[in-house]
Amino acid sequence: MASAAMLVPLVLVLCTAAASAAVVEHTFKVGGTKITQLCMNSVIYTANQQLPGPTIEVTEGDTLVVHAVNDSPYPLSLHWHGVYQLRSGWNDGANKITQCPIQPSGNFTYRFNITGQEGTLWWHAHSSLLRATIYGALIIKPRNGPSGYPFPEPYEEIPILLGEWWNRNVDDVENDGYLTGLGPQISDALTINGMPGDQNRCKGSAMYEVEVEYGKTCLLRIINAAVNVELFFKVAGHTFTVVAADASYTKPYATDVIVIAPGQTVDALMNTTASPGRYYMAAHVFDSKTVAVPFDQSTATGIVKYKGVPNYAPAAMPSLPPHDDVVTAGRFYWSLTGLARPSDPGVPTTVDHNMVVTFGLDQAPCAPNQTKCSGFALVAAMNRNSFQFPDQKVSLLEALYKGVPGVYSEDFPDFPPPMQGFRKATAVKKVKYNDVVEVVLQSEQYSSTLGTENHPIHLHGFDFYLLAQGLGRFNPSMKSKYNLVDPQVRNTVAVPAGGWAVIRFMANNPGMWFMHCHLDAHLPLGLAMVFEVLNGPAPNLLPPPPVDHPKCHG
């Protein structure tokens, strides 16, 4: 595995009081890292020679400063997944949306405040498939310490980052996917905290292990950092109580299996009251595609070992659900409810913008430079708009701030247009500050040969209320199913294959905010759109860009 941390975070306390806000400072050097995985030697790109990358811990109200140094050969940006970036949208890290990428040998300092959020988020590269190896946890502690948790204080907190591994350079994987027109090849393994475990053909593969004490309560901070797959996760002989999702508290939900889509996080309490021994934790793919397509069928494993138990003791393996178990997945996703805090204003009841956004995959003619393409290439769209990243030397946010014409159009449709095929466009939906937006997200079968699948839809810049979700087609009568009392609060929703989800949010954050599928195979195909949120009254204004903001190079 990669070496231990190169740098320890420097915490500069601004006030002498223990509970005062602080500046938490890190330096992330992104560069090549030699690693042996699955019996193969590879060079991958990581932050600070670590896989996963460094865990960031802050307290609510702190300011986070990350000096990003790009020693890789690839332009890149870093995204702080789920952080509101209230009036700090220049730091969101969405490539060509809120910033131009940091060029090789370049650097940029991300600086933003984290207020009004607690729980488990994460950070990752937002440039090509580089996020397969450039990612880490971002943990936000309550301002008043563990007593601020709305559940009993855990004895131990354990980050569990689930990922994917390729035996090839991931940039080559992505490029080949473009040349064939069919997207990237499936991964060679799944990982838990960067390690595949022992359930593969490579004898002696690295496996994550955590030691626990009997009779305690652990808080597992579970993150799906995988690039293209939803996952089932279990620990043999143990059950969970889910207490948060996407850094928003939930009412306690008891389960023996976690279902988690790319981009999502789940906080789950686990009591260590099983017979002392060794127990496998395991994860494998949840795949709900309606057309059979190959997927990674490996199982990632780790070990929960009770203190005092010898390392050679046999370990029990959990029974994971079948890969296509939509019943178990639906039960998990649809059973979670939100736990409102006193400061939560509740679900806004007046809606200014009602939208229906369909999305899916379609077929397009091969482009001239897709030299390995045969017959057709994949394309993706939202409301028949296949999103195109701007090719001018400016990000969308800079174009908004400086009034640069011709970079984007403000004509993203509120409803699916009556057309076949798709149009390629950099189209945004413009809303006023504090407008309330409701979006029906509908998984659509654009092509009879491609079918449908689950799509994790992630919204930058906001949390949203998840009012309802279901299978089949949404119709207005389903509004009676809306949960307006205690809905989940999310930043990423797993929209079922051929199904729907309804989200609602208040646009109280000026800027350009990306909404896209968090399956990285689909993002470059165009499964994305942008919300343009106008300035409000002072101080709710988009500030000027940082002086060292990266410049675009076309």
Swiss-Prot record:
Molecular function terms from GO: copper ion binding; hydroquinone:oxygen oxidoreductase activity; oxidoreductase activity
Glycosylation sites: 107, 113, 271, 369
GO biological process: lignin catabolic process
Binding site for Cu cation 1: 79, 458
Positions of the Plastocyanin-like domain: 29-145, 156-309, 411-537
Note on cofactor: Binds 4 Cu cations per monomer.
Cofactor(s) needed: Cu cation
Protein name stated in the entry: Laccase-8
Organism: Oryza sativa subsp. japonica
